[in-house]
Amino acid sequence: MSLLLRPYESVFVVFGETGVKCGKNRRMYARKTGEVVELPAKGWEISVSRPLAWPEFTRTEYTETGSLAAPGRLPEFSGTVRYRMQFEARAGRAVLSLGEAYEAVQVWVNGRKAGDAICPPYLFFLEEGMLQDGENELVAEVTNTLAKAHHDNVFDRYWVQEPTGLLGPVKVEYME
């Protein structure tokens, strides 16, 4: 068995009487073709859902990736932020990179689940058939912690808060 992990990555390997169960061979480390589709930072549909409201989302006025914790945006928001974008691409195997995100992420491409990540790297293998020629849809849900909703705690008051949401850059890199 061969195993290659990037920083922060982990896997579970279960040994038993029937052999080793490793799940799908994701081949995330296949060679890149050099073809990249970069998704713009602007033009996203961004919706939010607070923990007790989930799975109901409310659309925001924001349309650009970047920290929603910035002053004048949603600095006290705790919950899930949904990012939706239509983009042009071709069919093929690829890796979707979300760049930076805070914290846990779930991703769908054209309605198919691409995966989950609780820490960087926010990379998702897009199997053959997930991307189609022409218009595609990416949905990424980024969930932060409850720290921002409870920042008035005397112990947390002076801590520097992490960003909220999808910071990017977001890109699709094609694989052989």
Regions found by a protein language model. Name each.
Residues M1-G23:
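C-terminal beta-strand-rich structural cap/linker in extracellular carbohydrate-active enzymes
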Residues M1-L3, L123-G129:
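Exposed aromatic-hydrophobic patches
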Residues L5-P7, A91, Q132-D133:
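Surface-exposed loops/turns
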Residues V11, A94, G134-N136:
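Exposed beta-strand face motif in extracellular beta-rich ectodomains
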Residues V20-V81, E128-E176:
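An acidic-aromatic loop/edge-strand motif
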Residues F77-E88, Y122-F124:
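Short beta-strands within extracellular/lumenal beta-sheet-rich domains
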Residues F87-N110, L138-E141:
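Aromatic-lined ligand-binding clefts that engage carbohydrates, nucleic acids, or primary amines
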Residues A114-G115:
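Short hydrophobic beta-strand segments in globular cytosolic domains
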